[in-house]
Amino acid sequence: MVKSFFITGTDTDVGKTLVARTLLLEFVAHGIQCAGYKPISAGCARTPDGLRNLDAVLLQEAANLSLPYDMVNPYAFEPPIAPHIAASEARDAITLKGLSDGLRQIEQAGAELVVVEGAGGWFLPLDRKHLLSDWVKQENIPVIMVVGAKLGCLNHALLTFAAIRNDNLPVAGWVMNRLYGSMSHYQENLDTLRGLLPAPFLGEIPFVNNPLEADLRGRLDISPLL
């Protein structure tokens, strides 16, 4: 049976792609045939090959299962706005079935493990009736939560964790990502979350100037995920 993990964050721009990419590299190092799946992206660049999202490209490159871009990122939109608004403007529709069909295609392509990266935070609208979290719940995918270390992260992390658990989904682990070179009382914030979050702590991502170019293998403990 193919294993999947869904990467969510306490906010947008907290390092979901960085963590997803790092996890993929770790799984590859363990000899697991894995793929990245970024089903929804906005803010894509126009290229000769079509719309391309940097986050999705990074997942595509980190995986050891070679897949065409459109399989990694089936819903790609150019405007850097909420995806459901971008989809409406493009006269497109993001559907639960479409998301599931994309995941099934990757599974059938030979993946043993799929790292699925969400968009935005946990409650990302797909339209006026559905959320991306509805799909994660439908697929029953264990969740990995990325906490962006900044003022307010305690509340954001606890709210996100509670929302995931309220959807009856397991939190397979969580990661603290240092967004800035310095943060007042960073260690105290981390220690507080380690005491309050009843889920495996997979590790810390240090602050780096070019995070998406950094090789952070060895920073995360994937043993709880294997």
Curated annotation (Swiss-Prot):
Metal-binding recorded as keyword: yes
Any one annotated GO CC term: cytosol
GO molecular function (one): magnesium ion binding
Catalytic activity field: (7R,8S)-7,8-diammoniononanoate + CO2 + ATP = (4R,5S)-dethiobiotin + ADP + phosphate + 3 H(+)
Cross-referenced SUPFAM superfamilies: P-loop containing nucleoside triphosphate hydrolases (SSF52540)
Top-level taxon of the source organism: Bacteria
Reported cofactor(s): Mg(2+)
Signal peptide boundaries: none
Gene Ontology terms describing biological process: biotin biosynthetic process
Metabolic or biological pathway, per its Swiss-Prot or TrEMBL entry: Cofactor biosynthesis; biotin biosynthesis; biotin from 7,8-diaminononanoate: step 1/2
Catalytic class of the enzyme: ligase
Catalytic residues, chain numbering: K38
Compartment annotation: Cytoplasm
Annotated residues for binding of ATP: 13-18, 55, 117-120, 177-178, 206-208, 213
Record keywords: ATP-binding, Biotin biosynthesis, Cytoplasm, Ligase, Magnesium, Metal-binding, Nucleotide-binding
EC code: 6.3.3.3
Gene3D superfamilies for the chain: P-loop containing nucleotide triphosphate hydrolases
Binding-site list for Mg(2+): T17, D55, E117
HAMAP family linked to this entry: BioD (MF_00336)
Known role: Catalyzes a mechanistically unusual reaction, the ATP-dependent insertion of CO2 between the N7 and N8 nitrogen atoms of 7,8-diaminopelargonic acid (DAPA, also called 7,8-diammoniononanoate) to form a ureido ring.
Family designation: Belongs to the dethiobiotin synthetase family.
Subunit architecture: Homodimer.
Protein name from the UniProt record: ATP-dependent dethiobiotin synthetase BioD
